[in-house]
């Protein structure tokens, strides 16, 4: 169990954290009814359940109180300055009361939900008759956006940025919209305390391609995990105390949020034999500095940070010492000492160290102000995952003061910032838990559809996987819906995975080609008599195979196409070249394995087919053009002997390499066993 880092996040080296916007804590029947409707929609495992249609009807009824698009546009154009959504809500509350305010909030959320599901194509139009109009979902999205829904504004801004789904590209307007949403996210401060090595977005398509695949987010939430940690902590396990400390700090997996209990767990982990966990010392320093679970004690914070450094070289501890010095929490402000500590943290790849160092250069504290260099350092903080760095970089690229103005990059940075601030990961993790734990594919499809509307590539790909592979949505148009989604993914992200999946659908005749999208670049080795389906599939394979970063799966599929003559000219040598290129482009063994195996199988297949053809048994499914040099004739005894010898030699080669692989696997297992600690 690895140690935990509570990430110290400071905008300008300040200690205080911004609080989330807090609505009145009174119960609201309107909001509660909306929440029940959403849960009703998510609870079923298939779109065909009667309660799903009922939920759609309720959402449509909730959305019906929203003003028309024309009214909302006139309201916006009639205002001298853009009104913030929170201000509008307060005005409605003051003029009409809390119920009217809540109905406004529910109406815009319902509009966004219905719009996102209609755009995917899984909304029951019989339950929402007005949605039969093909433009309805775009108008609904814009209405929700103009009403101030943050997710709707993100989704509409994303469409303005990329120019798709019937929305004309307008990067300046997209930048303005996403910047406004990002500013709301900034007010929240860091979403929560963070564990080093957060789970990345997970792709369900990898389940079909990697036998060792598992969901990190689900594994981290295993039902018995907390019980195991409690047992280990009772037996004095330092790492278990550290893990339980984190859970108590944030209120995770049934552990009640309790800063005092978190402090005690970290204290136990820090007091064990050998000086305790260095990470626990860092966490104690963080809590002493912020007065979390204990009184503020800057001297004790410095002591714990120093121990974390001496016992484990913990990079964030250097940053913590820098914050103490910068803010003068130990006496006089000392920018020189703060700079030195931030530099030490940055040397150890600490994102907060880089962020604070960048701020020192931008503000000119203890160094000549150099905003351009500060932005360069801020880029590194963003690469390492600092929560606020994308926002600051977005401002820099939008203004063009420290760097050349770049609207597209600024928009992308604000979009990245919004993704983290508005907790897209929670929806994605809940969705994958629906699939793997609860076998609720429909609930997962709903969650992924909402997040994909915001511009999440992984969520969009998972929508496609669920449409193709699950029973969440079983209507006849599910493959066409998947293909439409794949084309949008390709347009927005240039995704090689999406190109391969779309090519597979085209090759198997499950969807019709889009002549303007799928057939715009002819492959020079395309077969003249190939069908439109095969030509379209090949073009997507080629685009993914020969992109800036060649994609192994596309290369191996194109290799098979050349071997079998599917839409391309038959060329055995070209097949082997593509299989080898796929292996070279692979990032891990599960990507490389199909390429290596394809090369071995194709050679053996050609050898066996050649022998079969000589004996007048046919070419074993391979195109005859592979054997154009062979004459159809009966084989003499000597020829039979030669063919038999070739087959035996081929089998011997396979056996030899199989033995090599087994030997290597056995050696790896033995080495791993030797590395395990003895009991």
Predicted regions and their residues:
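TPR/TPR-like alpha-solenoid helical repeat scaffolds
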Residues: 190-219, 395-398, 426-436, 463-469, ...
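Short coil/turn and helix-start
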Residues: 46-50, 81-86, 100-104, 119-132, ...
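Hydrophobic face of amphipathic alpha-helices that form TPR/SEL1-like repeat modules
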Residues: 58, 62, 111-120, 124, ...
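Helix-start (N-cap) detector for alpha-helical repeat units in TPR-like alpha-solenoids
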Residues: 108, 150-152, 189, 238-239, ...
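Hydrophobic/aromatic packing residues within the alpha-helices of TPR/SEL1-like helical repeat arrays
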Residues: 95, 141, 178, 229, ...
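Alpha-helical linker/edge segments of TPR/alpha-solenoid repeat scaffolds
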Residues: 188, 201-211, 293, 330, ...
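TPR/TPR-like (Sel1-like) alpha-helical repeat modules
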Residues: 168-186, 383-387, 395, 404-422, ...
């Amino acid at each position: 169990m690895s140690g935990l880092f509570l990430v110290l996040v400071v905008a300008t080296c300040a200690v205080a954290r911004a609080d989330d916007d807090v609505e009145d804590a009174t119960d609201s029947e309107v909001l509660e009814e909306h929440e029940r409707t959403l849960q009703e929609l998510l609870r079923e495992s298939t779109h065909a359940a009667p309660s799903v249609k009922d939920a759609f009807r309720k959402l449509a009824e909730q959305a019906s109180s929203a003003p028309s698009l024309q009214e909302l546009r006139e309201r916006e154009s009639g205002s001298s300055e853009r009104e913030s959504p929170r201000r509008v809500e307060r005005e409605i509350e003051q003029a009409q009361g809390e119920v009217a305010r809540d109905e406004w909030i529910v109406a815009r959320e319902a509009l966004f939900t219905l719009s996102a599901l209609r755009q995917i194509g899984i909304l029951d139009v019989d339950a929402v008759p007005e949605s039969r109009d093909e433009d309805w979902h775009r108008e609904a999205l814009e209405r929700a956006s103009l009403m101030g829904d943050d997710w709707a504004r993100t989704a509409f801004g994303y469409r303005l940025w990329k120019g798709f789904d019937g929305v004309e590209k307008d990067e300046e307007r997209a930048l303005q919209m996403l910047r406004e949403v990002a500013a709301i996210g900034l007010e929240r401060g860091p979403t929560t305390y963070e564990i080093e090595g957060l789970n990345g977005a997970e792709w369900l398509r990898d389940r079909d391609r990697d036998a060792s695949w598992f969901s990190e987010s689900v594994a981290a939430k295993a039902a018995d995990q907390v019980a195991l940690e409690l047992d280990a902590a009772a037996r004095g396990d330092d790492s278990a105390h550290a893990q339980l400390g984190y859970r108590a700090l944030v209120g995770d997996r049934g552990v009640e949020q309790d800063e005092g209990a978190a402090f005690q767990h970290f204290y136990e982990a820090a007091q064990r034999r050998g000086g305790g966990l260095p990470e626990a010392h860092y966490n104690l320093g963080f809590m002493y500095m912020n007065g979390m679970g204990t009184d503020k004690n800057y001297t004790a914070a410095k002591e714990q940070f120093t121990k974390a450094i001496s016992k484990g070289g913990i990079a964030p501890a250097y940053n913590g010492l820098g914050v103490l010095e910068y803010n003068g929490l130990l006496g006089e402000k000392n920018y020189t000492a703060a700079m030195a500590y931030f530099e030490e943290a940055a040397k150890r790849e600490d994102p907060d160290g880089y962020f604070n160092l960048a701020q020192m250069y931008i503000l000119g504290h203890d160094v000549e102000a150099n905003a351009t260099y500060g932005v360069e350092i801020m880029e590194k903080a963003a690469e390492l995952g600092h929560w606020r760095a994308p926002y600051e970089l977005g401002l820099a690229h939008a203004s063009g003061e420290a760097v050349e103005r770049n609207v597209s990059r600024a928009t992308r940075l604000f979009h990245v910032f919004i993704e983290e601030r508005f907790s897209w990961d929670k929806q994605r993790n809940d969705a994958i838990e629906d699939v793997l734990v609860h076998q609720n594919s429909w609930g997962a499809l709903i969650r992924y559809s909402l997040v994909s509307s915001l511009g999440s590539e992984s969520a969009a790909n998972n929508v496609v996987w669920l449409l193709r592979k699950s029973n969440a949505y079983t209507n006849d148009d599910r493959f066409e819906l998947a293909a439409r989604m794949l084309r949008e993914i390709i347009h927005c992200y240039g995704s090689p995975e999406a190109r391969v999946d779309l090519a597979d659908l085209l090759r198997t005749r499950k969807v019709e080609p889009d002549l303007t999208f799928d057939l715009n670049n002819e492959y020079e080795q395309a077969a003249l008599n190939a069908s439109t389906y095969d030509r379209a599939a090949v073009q997507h394979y080629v685009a993914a195979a020969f992109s800036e970063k060649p994609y192994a799966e596309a290369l191996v599929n194109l290799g098979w196409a050349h071997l079998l003559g599917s839409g391309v000219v038959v060329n055995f040598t070209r097949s082997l070249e593509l299989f080898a290129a796929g292996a070279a482009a692979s990032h891990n063994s599960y990507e490389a394995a199909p390429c290596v195996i394809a090369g071995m199988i194709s050679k053996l297949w050609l050898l066996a087919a050649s022998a079969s053809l000589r004996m007048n048994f046919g070419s074993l499914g391979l195109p005859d053009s592979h054997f154009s040099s062979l004459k159809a004739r009966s084989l003499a005894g000597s020829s039979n002997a030669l063919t038999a010898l070739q087959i035996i030699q081929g089998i011997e080669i396979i056996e030899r390499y199989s033995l090599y692989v087994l030997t290597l696997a056995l050696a790896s297992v033995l080495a791993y066993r030797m590395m395990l600690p003895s009991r």
